[in-house]
A protein has these predicted regions:
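Conserved class I S-adenosyl-L-methionine
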Residues: 1-40
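A short acidic, Gly/Pro-enriched loop at the edge of an enzyme's catalytic core
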Residues: 102-110
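Residues lining the SAM
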Residues: 113-117, 142-144
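A short, conserved alpha-helix within the catalytic core of class I
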Residues: 120-129
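Conserved catalytic/acceptor-binding region of the Class I
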Residues: 130-214
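Conserved Class I S-adenosyl-L-methionine
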Residues: 186-275
Length: 275
């Protein structure tokens, strides 16, 4: 099978579901990065593959200007709306693929990638971002899983979401191979990101671990949004069968919830910092 290539339908229809279905980054992540990086409310942040601004807006108080870049126009519209609702006035949004940078955006003290670098041409993007970092600037990659929590036998205040059954339902509609845009994305060996970064001239990395084990209360609606926030089960993939899938998903969740609610134990968040 040919190698997967990006196309603009990757997250088609997912933007509105993302901030509802994904667990928000905790305030501790922003505080931890503030302390680790010495952020003081000055300078510029570039958030690459920003989606609906989940990390961009969390870090906005620690910079004079934050710039979110994403290839998906709908994601940027949601991000701009969230910034407006939160009264955040120092955020800018630009539609662009990471591979198209720098795009006359200028230099940045910090460049972040939150759950996004794996979608990109990593050697190309690493090299281009290197030229966008101001002297002393740093690259920060946030590794997290926010659509679902940890599996485990430990008891929680409410039942865990039936993720195995959810995955099986998605596979029944879309097939067993993970969908991604107009193609499929096969599981395989991941690129050695440390080798890529060092080849591009970066030094490091330093690591910061934040959170983990917190209990998150989640509703049926949040779980439905979580499924639709994923590229592998984005709404457009279901075509005319979308209403049928959503009805089955809702029935599955309603029948296993405790009065419409679930509990999940959050995963830790790792940040990898290069300079």
């Amino acid at each position: 099978m040919s190698e997967w290539t990006w196309d603009e339908s990757l997250y088609a229809g997912s933007a509105a579901h993302y901030p509802v279905g994904r667990m928000a980054y905790p305030e501790a992540l922003g505080v931890g990065l503030r302390d680790e990086l010495g952020l003081d409310g000055q300078g510029r942040l570039l958030d690459v593959g920003c989606g609906p601004g989940s990390l961009t807006l969390l870090l906005a108080p620690y910079f004079a200007t934050v710039v979110g870049v994403d290839a998906d126009a709908d994601m940027l519209a949601v991000a701009a709306g969230r910034a407006s609702d939160a009264g955040i006035g120092n955020a800018e949004w630009h539609q662009s693929r990471a591979e198209e940078l720098p795009g006359e955006l200028g230099a940045f003290q910090i460049v972040t990638f939150a759950q996004s670098f794996h979608w990109m041409d990593q050697p190309l993007v690493a090299a281009r971002i290197r030229g966008m970092l101001a002297p002393g600037g740093r690259w920060v990659q946030v590794r997290a899983t926010t659509h679902r929590g940890l599996d485990g036998p430990d008891e929680l205040p409410r039942p865990r979401p039936p993720w195995d059954a959810i995955d099986a339902l998605v596979a029944r509609y879309l097939g067993p191979v993970r969908r991604a845009g107009q193609g499929v994305r096969l599981n395989g060996a991941l690129p050695d990101e440390e080798e890529i970064m060092k080849a591009a001239g970066y030094e490091g990395p330093d690591r910061l671990i934040v959170g983990g084990d917190e209990i998150e209360d989640r509703t049926v609606e949040q779980l439905i949004a979580s499924v639709f926030s994923l590229s592998s089960s984005a709404p457009h993939l279901f075509g005319t069968r979308l209403p049928d899938f959503e009805a089955e998903l809702r029935e599955l969740l309603t029948s296993t919830a405790d009065h419409g609610r679930f509990a999940e134990r959050r995963r830790e968040i790792e940040t990898v910092i290069w300079h």
